[in-house]
Amino acid sequence: QASQTGKCGDNITWTLDDKGNLELTGTGKMYDYTLMGAPWGGTIESVTISEGIENIGKYAFSFCGKLTKVVIPNSVKEILEGVFRGCEGLETVTIGESVASIGPSAFSGCRGLLSVTIPSAVKVIEAMAFFNCGKLKSLSVDKENKVYDSRGNCNAIIETATNTLIYGCKNTVIPNTVTKIGEDAFAYCVALTSIEIPNSVTDINSGAFIACI
């Protein structure tokens, strides 16, 4: 079967070979898609995103269950809504140094994801970005980040200004400077067996520990 090709941005071309390897080349912004609506479908096994691409369009790789790892280049500034939603086989993702925003449900349902490092440029992590990622073992934030932190290597993402823990994982140790646990912070964290909530926490938002079974 010959490789398939098309456009996925005004100046971006996609090519899919017969082994399921997708390559995106070009510059500028990607098109947005509906859930599972991207032209390459859900059967891709790898994706290579070239330097020069500035964002990853909505739902671009949603429910691509065979993807196991992704490297997002340093030219990318935005990961939009639902980009990797439902990619259950995704284990590792490298988020490029220029990414400033991670959209809603961007990695929601990535049940195989093991670790996430938030780079220094990230200013916005939207709701449910890492919802239902039950296998996460490691969550860290670059020490130069001005908005989020993972103080004391706590294995969590904390909104610095409000001392709100927004995402945790099975290895999280909640620091005694955290005052609030955000909505869905540990939702579907099925590997979680126990957690100590320090006295500093005065507010636990709805759904913080939903479906931790």
Task: Kindly label every feature range from the protein language model.
Residues A2-T5, G86, G112:
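Positively charged, low-complexity intrinsically disordered regions
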Residues D17-G28, G42-N55, G65-E78, E88-S101, ...:
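Structural signature of tandem-repeat unit edges
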Residues G57-A60, L80-R85, G103-A106, A127-A129, ...:
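Consensus positions within tandem repeat domains that build extended binding/scaffold surfaces
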